[in-house]
């Protein structure tokens, strides 16, 4: 049975443009995988704890020395990493907030990036340890940034995902949403979704 991990990072939940496009992807995916399972992480509905010194210390404390609170921190990280490993594909809805990703998504990534678990350092540099799989990024922007120096978001996403071993990355952009181009941008994005699902 195929498994799709859906990550929605919009502050506005299903009302967010990136979430709407990610939901569209999921519905199309279901038609191709009627017996498939969709695992959802919606950061508008769940608390994603930002890393602090206490949490970092928990991740570096040997298992036999952890307190109950530290063990809970590690178990959260272990769980979301296991979800990624178990998925056959990932769809990620990402709005552009102040030229970057939502802070909740950054916090989620911080719990995933663990030396010896999702990446390791070697003499020739870091090596990602996650099993590669398709990652579909539905990027929703109010303005137009694709291909511009100001689009630091796309570069960051590629760099981070590559770092942990995820290299099969597919971007689908919906831009100009606050410039009177929403209908056209959504239609184009949905067409690209159809093409990706059919590929």
Swiss-Prot record:
Under InterPro entries, the record lists: Flavodoxin_fold (IPR003680), Flavoprotein-like_sf (IPR029039), FMN-dep_NADH:Q_OxRdtase_AzoR1 (IPR050104), NADH:quinone_OxRdtase_FMN_depd (IPR023048)
Provide the gene name from the record. Answer: azoR
Lineage, uppermost ranks: Bacteria, Pseudomonadati, Pseudomonadota, Gammaproteobacteria, Cellvibrionales
**Is Flavoprotein one of the keywords?**
yes
GO: which molecular function terms? Answer: electron transfer activity; FMN binding; oxidoreductase activity, acting on NAD(P)H as acceptor; oxidoreductase activity, acting on NAD(P)H, quinone or similar compound as acceptor
Xref: Pfam families:
Flavodoxin_2
What does the protein in this record do?
A: Quinone reductase that provides resistance to thiol-specific stress caused by electrophilic quinones.
The organism's place on the tree of life at top rank = Bacteria
Residues annotated as binding FMN are 10
Q: Where is the signal peptide?
A: none
* Catalysed transformations (reactions): 2 a quinone + NADH + H(+) = 2 a 1,4-benzosemiquinone + NAD(+); N,N-dimethyl-1,4-phenylenediamine + anthranilate + 2 NAD(+) = 2-(4-dimethylaminophenyl)diazenylbenzoate + 2 NADH + 2 H(+)
Q: Which family does it belong to?
A: Belongs to the azoreductase type 1 family.
User: Subunit info?
Assistant: Homodimer.
> Which keywords belong to this entry?
Flavoprotein, FMN, NAD, Oxidoreductase
The record's cofactor note says: Binds 1 FMN per subunit.
Tell me what organism the protein belongs to: Cellvibrio japonicus (strain Ueda107) (Pseudomonas fluorescens subsp. cellulosa)
Q: What does this protein need as cofactor?
A: FMN
Q: Per its record, how is this protein called by name?
A: FMN-dependent NADH:quinone oxidoreductase
- EC number from the UniProt entry: 1.6.5.-, 1.7.1.17
Kindly indicate whether the keyword Flavoprotein belongs to this entry.
yes
